[in-house]
Amino acid sequence: MDKILGASFLVLWLQLCWVSGQQKEKSDQQQVKQSPQSLIVQKGGISIINCAYENTAFDYFPWYQQFPGKGPALLIAIRPDVSEKKEGRFTISFNKSAKQFSSHIMDSQPGDSATYFCAAS
């Protein structure tokens, strides 16, 4: 029984190290750059957050919203064949030639206070 438990622990440890190594490689390459780092907007204002990418093979560009103590949730996403997509007060704009996409929140509300981040894959 001890040998089986020891083997299970070793497999789990190796998987965690592999995942950790993968994350380091991705962070070293910095797949996307988001700006600004923080943003203060008055109620009713427009929030604009930009994201730039380098890899032209990417074909999916999501924005996520994360409230304190919660996991990230997909807010809106776009593909390169569409220049703009709207969902309620949220708009995502895509500029393929500039290799960037932007998130716009119209009529910002106090309930919109959260962490927003972009991704590309």
UniProtKB/Swiss-Prot annotation:
UniProt domain Ig-like: residue ranges: 30-121
Q: Which GO terms describe its biological process?
A: adaptive immune response
Query: What Gene Ontology cellular-component terms does the record carry?
Result: T cell receptor complex
Record-annotated disulphide pairs = C51-C118
Q: Kindly list the GO molecular function terms attached to this UniProt entry.
A: peptide antigen binding
Which cellular compartments is it found in? Cell membrane
Q: Which UniProt keywords apply?
A: Adaptive immunity, Cell membrane, Disulfide bond, Glycoprotein, Immunity, Immunoglobulin domain, Membrane, Receptor, Signal, T cell receptor
Chief location of this protein?
membrane
Glycan attachment sites: N95
| Complex and partners | Alpha-beta TR is a heterodimer composed of an alpha and beta chain; disulfide-linked. The alpha-beta TR is associated with the transmembrane signaling CD3 coreceptor proteins to form the TR-CD3 (TcR or TCR). The assembly of alpha-beta TR heterodimers with CD3 occurs in the endoplasmic reticulum where a single alpha-beta TR heterodimer associates with one CD3D-CD3E heterodimer, one CD3G-CD3E heterodimer and one CD247 homodimer forming a stable octameric structure. CD3D-CD3E and CD3G-CD3E heterodimers preferentially associate with TR alpha and TR beta chains, respectively.
Q: What does this protein do, in the record's words?
A: V region of the variable domain of T cell receptor (TR) alpha chain that participates in the antigen recognition. Alpha-beta T cell receptors are antigen specific receptors which are essential to the immune response and are present on the cell surface of T lymphocytes. Recognize peptide-major histocompatibility (MH) (pMH) complexes that are displayed by antigen presenting cells (APC), a prerequisite for efficient T cell adaptive immunity against pathogens.
Q: What is the name attached to this protein's record?
A: T cell receptor alpha variable 23/delta variable 6
Species of origin reads Homo sapiens
